[in-house]
Amino acid sequence: SLWRKIMKGLMLGIVGFCLLFSNTALCGDIDAGEARYAQNCGNCHGPAGMGLASYPKLKGKEIPYLIDRLNTYRAGTKIGPNSDLMIMMAQPLSDVEIANLAAYLNAQK
């Protein structure tokens, strides 16, 4: 579909930009993301984002999806059964921390 082609092009553009410029604020630092994940996320989402019980698997998810979800929770929007907890966990995160988390989780294939 046209939408899928647009999204694929956007994703390739983001990846290309990151490879060319390695800007941590846009691309994320995997090591910093791993440290933040261990501190904030691992107890519910499991080791390396594998998912536990009612907490979804995050491992290998696309970066734009992860950033969108964390930004949505950070804004206080409820989008799932664990929204209250996720809002509380996401609100203190900076844009850089969100990018780092997304980079780490995406790298867990």
Language-model regions: role of each:
Residues 10-16:
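Sec-dependent signal peptide hydrophobic core
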Residues 52-59, 74-109:
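Axial heme c-ligation environment in periplasmic c-type cytochrome domains
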Residues 31-39, 59-68:
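Sequence context surrounding c-type heme c attachment/ligation sites in exported
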Residues 8-10, 31, 67-68, 107-108:
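Predominantly soluble domains enriched in secretory-pathway, periplasmic, or organellar proteins
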Residues 28-50:
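Sequence/structural segment immediately N-terminal to covalent heme-attachment motifs in c-type
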Residues 1-7:
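Short, Lys/Arg-enriched N-terminal segments with co-localized hydrophobic residues
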Residues 22-23:
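N-terminal signal peptide c-region/cleavage motif recognized by signal peptidases
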